[in-house]
Amino acid sequence: VGGGINTLEDFDRVLKCGADKVSVNSGALRDPGLIPAAAQKYGDQCVVLSADVKRVNGQFRVFAKGGREDTGRDALDWISWCVAHGAGEICLNSIDTDGVRTGFDLEMLDAVAARVNVPIIASGGAGKKEDFLELFHHKGIDAGLAAGIFHQKLLTIHDLKTYLNENGVEMRL
């Protein structure tokens, strides 16, 4: 569960409603101490850092407020710091590829995977089922996230899962 997570009380609220993991983005940017505090209280497996990342002058930068505000932070440094301080998983959204349907940003994903050793969920860029197959055969990436491709009925979840399973990606059908 994510969105509007700014305090430990917000973690409490969603966990009491049944969430297993809590995703934090802007709340951690405003108060970086939220990551270690939440990890200490609930365990790092519960703390998911969500990062909206975009290239600015060749550098991966962290953005806030739904990708509208450049924080000036280097994304690789920020993500590494958060993992070192208790983020047990990363949800990495590429602003550059989000909604474009040209495939996941493998260069960005590789750069992050080289710096951390926690699960990475890739988000942004899926346009066809082959994009997911490429992602899931890519070293260091644990999961993929997509929305528009399903909302706009370009692909069904069932068809995607069947295709991936037929191509060697094990999953629950």
Segments the model singles out, each with a brief description of its role:
Residues 4-5, 57, 68-70, 97-102, ...:
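Short, small-residue-enriched loops and turns at beta-alpha junctions
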Residues 14-16, 37-38, 61-65, 104-107, ...:
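Short, glycine/charged-enriched secondary-structure capping and boundary segments
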Residues 15, 19-92, 96-97:
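Conserved anion-binding
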Residues 36-52, 101-128, 168-169:
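Alpha-helix-loop-beta-strand connector modules within alpha/beta enzyme cores
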